[in-house]
From Swiss-Prot:
PANTHER family according to UniProt: MITOCHONDRIAL RIBOSOME RECYCLING FACTOR PSEUDO 1, RIBOSOME RECYCLING FACTOR
Disulphide bridges: none
Originating gene: frr
Protein name, per record: Ribosome-recycling factor
Top-level taxonomic group: Bacteria
GO molecular function ontology, one term from the record: ribosomal large subunit binding
Biological role: Responsible for the release of ribosomes from messenger RNA at the termination of protein biosynthesis. May increase the efficiency of translation by recycling ribosomes from one round of translation to another.
Coiled coil segments of this chain: none
Main location (coarse class): cytoplasm
Entry-linked Gene3D superfamilies: 3.30.1360.40, Ribosome-recycling factor
Amino acid sequence: MINKIDNIQTDSEIHMKKCIKNFKTNINNIHIGRISPNILNNIRVDYYGISTPLSQVANAIVEDSRTLAITVFDHQLIKSTEKAIFMSDLELIPISYGNTIRVTLPALTEERRHTLIKMVRTEAEKSKIAVRSVRRIANDKTKILLKNKEINEDEEHFFQNEIQKLTNIWIKEIDIILAEKESELMKF
């Protein structure tokens, strides 16, 4: 019985850590001073009717601190690649030159800073929801153990408190990362 609870707790912690890792990855794609090919990680291109990650249909390299050169592998995908970049929430404007698409990072205005901060806050909220979802799943599993009389009510209550402590720790971690990123965005 205790072993099952430990497994649930361990699994919950692993999933919560993954939520934090995904959050860090997502906000690290939000750059302000220097452009990086990673900024394109979440962009998907219509590849003959299939939504495909941009990295699988093109190669992006840094030309200078504010410009990316994207070489599309299949010449027929240039228009759909341009459209995917333009339609993303990154506010990038793609310009094609033959098989190459150039993307320039927009100038960082006060309005752009606030837009980026909103994006980071949205990602933070999504991550908090994901952590809380892990908590809910763990609590549901303990309720099943209680229902099956594998644990008693005291054990269920204790375990739910432990999961809540974990949830609080990871949500606080998200808040710390968010504050650091907001500070970084306001410095530039």
